[in-house]
């Protein structure tokens, strides 16, 4: 016979393994920094003692994409760099998440030239867009919090309706975020 929740010890929490893994996945993101321009300086400053993004959110920097589940692309992505971004994204383990940080990564910034990709979402799927030129660390905080909320919704949908429904939700969220950026040249 099993114990009911009322009979169990008050310091013992009963839950499913899936819920525990989902909580750990959103509360302990391992991120791959991909800093390409001035936005990378703000990303680095967000990890310093004043803001301490990594410690506050339980995030760890990873040098290898195989160990990361979050990629933060900060700065201008050139057409020569685009295959490298795609290769690093493909090497990440599933589920993988992407934050596009700054105007250059979001829409190409002021560089409307033949050599610049007009938004990293033309190379890899992006989950969160952090605006600014360069964005302040607080904006990156907000982006990480939004990503954690999306991970919670994704995991709930995956548990309740299956992985296809969760992926459809993710794609709808990406389309909505892309359309909020407005038309591109």
Swiss-Prot record:
Superkingdom classification of source: Bacteria
GO biological process, one term: electron transport coupled proton transport
One Gene Ontology cellular component: plasma membrane
GO molecular function: 4 iron, 4 sulfur cluster binding; iron ion binding; NADH dehydrogenase (ubiquinone) activity; NADH:ubiquinone reductase (non-electrogenic) activity; quinone binding
EC number per UniProt: 7.1.1.-
Pfam families xrefs: Oxidored_q6 (PF01058)
Protein task: NDH-1 shuttles electrons from NADH, via FMN and iron-sulfur (Fe-S) centers, to quinones in the respiratory chain. The immediate electron acceptor for the enzyme in this species is believed to be ubiquinone. Couples the redox reaction to proton translocation (for every two electrons transferred, four hydrogen ions are translocated across the cytoplasmic membrane), and thus conserves the redox energy in a proton gradient.
Similarity-based family: Belongs to the complex I 20 kDa subunit family.
Name the record gives this protein: NADH-quinone oxidoreductase subunit B
Species this chain originates from: Thermomicrobium roseum (strain ATCC 27502 / DSM 5159 / P-2)
């Amino acid at each position: 016979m099993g114990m009911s929740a009322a009979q169990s010890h008050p310091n013992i929490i009963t839950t499913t393994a899936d819920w525990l893994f989902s909580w750990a996945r959103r509360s302990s993101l391992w991120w791959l920094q991909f800093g390409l321009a001035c936005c990378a300086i703000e990303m680095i400053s967000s990890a310093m003692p004043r803001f301490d993004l990594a410690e506050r959110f339980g995030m760890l920097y990873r040098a290898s994409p195989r160990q990361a589940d979050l990629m933060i692309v900060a700065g201008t992505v050139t057409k020569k760099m685009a295959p490298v971004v795609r290769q690093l994204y493909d090497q990440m383990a599933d589920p993988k998440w992407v934050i596009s940080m700054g105007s250059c990564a979001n829409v190409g910034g002021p560089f409307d030239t033949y050599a610049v990709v007009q938004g990293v979402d033309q190379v890899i799927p992006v989950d969160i867009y952090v605006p600014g030129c360069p964005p302040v660390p607080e904006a990156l905080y907000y982006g990480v919090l939004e990503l954690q909320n999306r991970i919670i919704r994704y995991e709930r949908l995956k548990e309740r309706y299956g992985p296809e429904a969760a992926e459809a939700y993710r794609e709808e969220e990406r389309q909505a975020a892309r359309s909020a950026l407005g038309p591109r040249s």
